[in-house]
Amino acid sequence: MLVNNYISKDFIPPKSNQPVSHGLEIINEFGLTHIPLFEGLHFIGNLSKETLEEAGPDEKLLQLKDFADDFTISENSSLLDAIQKFNNNASNILPVLNTEKQYLGFLMMDDVISGLSTMPFILEPGAIMVIEVSQKQFSISEIAKIAESNNARIIGLFVTDYPEDKTQITIKLIAESIASVSETFERFGYTVVYKFFHDEKEDLYKDRFEQLMKYLDV
């Protein structure tokens, strides 16, 4: 999933000779943390809402260029790259440039989150399991083999943390018995930190047990 599928042009970036008040109008209207600043076709940087609020409303935006933050994203970057840049720059907007450094539009964090929410990892039903293993032992192929040995199908996995000398992995999978998968991981030296699943059979047995209890109460 690439950035170029989510480029927006909902507003035109202000010109560098326009006043700070105009930049703030755009920021407030679209709920932005930053606004991109250009001098002609040359990208200068991103001015934060706080920088504009501290400046005089009649100052020209170009006068604030020394306070601009230099972050952009390429049109061929992935949405995961975008998430990292949003986080690193405490921003909800990323200017998108092509390989010639020309401005194509911008990327909004809400659009990226919406895009990621359509991934099979999110949409497909399944169990969520967080496992932990030493960094030396971490192997995607071994994790896949353990899951497959229990007739489980992995929908997706990713590394979520590095506590001390360990690696923590979040897995989403489809399995007949999540308990069997969990036990096998533990036999191979993994720690199962967390697991969540919805078991229809378990729900059925629970309902029948509750009905029996009600009958016995009568």
Where are these predicted regions, by residue range?
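Regulatory loop-to-helix N-cap segments in sensory/regulatory domains
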Residues: E54-G56, L116
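Bateman/CBS regulatory modules and CBS-like beta-alpha motifs in cytosolic regions of diverse proteins
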Residues: M1-I26, L37-E39, F43-N46, P57-K85, ...
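Cytosolic regulatory modules rich in charged/polar residues
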Residues: F71, T99, Y103-D111, G115-V218
